[in-house]
Regions:
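Catalytic binding pocket for nucleotide-activated donors in carbohydrate/polymer assembly enzymes
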Residues: 1
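Glycine-centered coil turns and helix-coil junctions that link the paired helices
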Residues: 95, 159, 235, 253, ...
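Long, charged low-complexity terminal regions
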Residues: 184, 197, 211-216, 224-231, ...
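Structural detector for internal amphipathic alpha-helices that build alpha-solenoid repeat scaffolds
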Residues: 70-80, 91, 102-114, 123, ...
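Short inter-helical turns and helix N-cap capping residues of alpha-solenoid HEAT/ARM repeat scaffolds
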Residues: 65-66, 97-98, 128-129, 160-162, ...
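Eukaryotic acidic, Ser/Thr-rich intrinsically disordered low-complexity regions
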Residues: 285-310
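Caspase-like cysteine protease fold
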Residues: 4-83
């Protein structure tokens, strides 16, 4: 949000108006919310922000030559439940020449988390703006569909000047099905125009794909409970969609400890974009209604259920 809105200061917005939309400490500018800069353009963002919401006005502002004004309009349309907002965001992402407008569209589509969001990720990973490419990799890994494996492997091999894109790819391959990742590696290596360091890249990718010991140890009853809980917490950052079936079986296994199940339910609350969310919701609904379980476990299942559902 900080990047999306910073340009409004140059159009006359108050620092306070800007900071209301910015929730990260690194973006602090000054403690005086009334500070503003005089706009050198015909736009007065201060006056614009004071206008009452009007759908037609926001749609009109989408034609502004300023990316910051377009972003303002998109956020307002989203917050006010504009009908067709998802289609509008997708179309704008596909057609806008402004990288920050495209990023705004992607960020808002992530909040909606529908078919348009999942499909636009295929475009985002080849966007000209590195931050969008890097962000799309994270989003793909949060969704977990195997159809995202090939474009990520291709980006790792052919987008070889973007180190952070490559890092994000290698860090999250383990959340996908192992066989799908290996198949994508083989396919990309057979097709790519890249000749230099191919075998070295293959080795790095295959090592990343085979680094699944934490998932295996989490599912193993031979692992200490302390380590299993530690591995559960790691699922909040790396949603292991490939082993969701095993994790759901753990939740319904009467021989597993309540402490471990509670920790796993808490971790599942982070699977907000996962394609396995319906399965997680089904089991959480079952657990929260099971009167034979402890109140603590049912409450945790209830919290996760409503976080994912809403």
């Amino acid at each position: 949000m900080a990047k999306e809105t910073l340009g409004r200061l140059g159009l006359g917005a108050l620092v306070g108006q800007w900071s209301k939309l910015t929730n990260i400490l690194e973006s602090h500018i000054t403690g005086d919310p009334t500070l503003r800069f005089q706009s050198i353009n015909e736009v007065d963002a201060n006056a614009l922000f004071k206008e009452p919401y009007s759908e037609s006005r926001m749609l009109e502002l989408l034609q502004s030559p300023y990316a910051d004004i377009q972003n303002f309009a998109l956020h307002n349309l989203y917050r006010n439940d504009y009908p067709g907002i998802s289609d509008l965001l997708r179309k704008t992402f596909e057609t806008s020449s402004f990288m920050m407008v495209r990023f705004t569209c992607l960020a808002l589509l992530e909040k909606i988390s529908d078919k348009n969001f999942r499909e636009v990720l295929h475009l985002a990973i080849t966007d000209s703006y590195e931050f969008i490419r890097r962000t799309s990799v994270r989003m793909m890994q949060h969704v977990g569909l195997n159809e995202y494996v090939y474009p990520q492997i291709k980006a790792y091999v052919e987008d070889n000047l973007s180190e952070r894109v490559a890092f994000n790819v290698s860090l999250g391959l383990q959340v996908f099905d192992q066989a799908a990742v290996q198949a994508a590696i083989d396919k990309v290596m057979a097709e790519t125009y890249v000749l230099q360091d191919k075998e070295e890249m293959r080795k790095v990718l295959e090592n990343a794909n085979n680094s699944r010991s934490m998932q295996k140890e989490l599912l193993s009853k031979e692992t200490s409970e302390r380590c299993r809980i530690l591995y559960c917490n790691s699922l909040k950052n790396h949603m292991a969609h490939a082993c969701v079936d095993g994790l759901l079986a753990l939740l319904t296994d009467s021989s597993e400890s309540e402490k471990l199940k509670t920790c796993l339910l808490e971790a599942f609350a982070w699977f907000t974009h996962s394609y396995r969310k319906p399965d997680i919701l089904r089991v959480c609904d079952q657990l929260r209604k099971d009167k034979s379980l402890s109140e603590n476990l049912r409450e945790e299942a209830d919290r996760t259920y409503y976080r994912l559902k809403n």
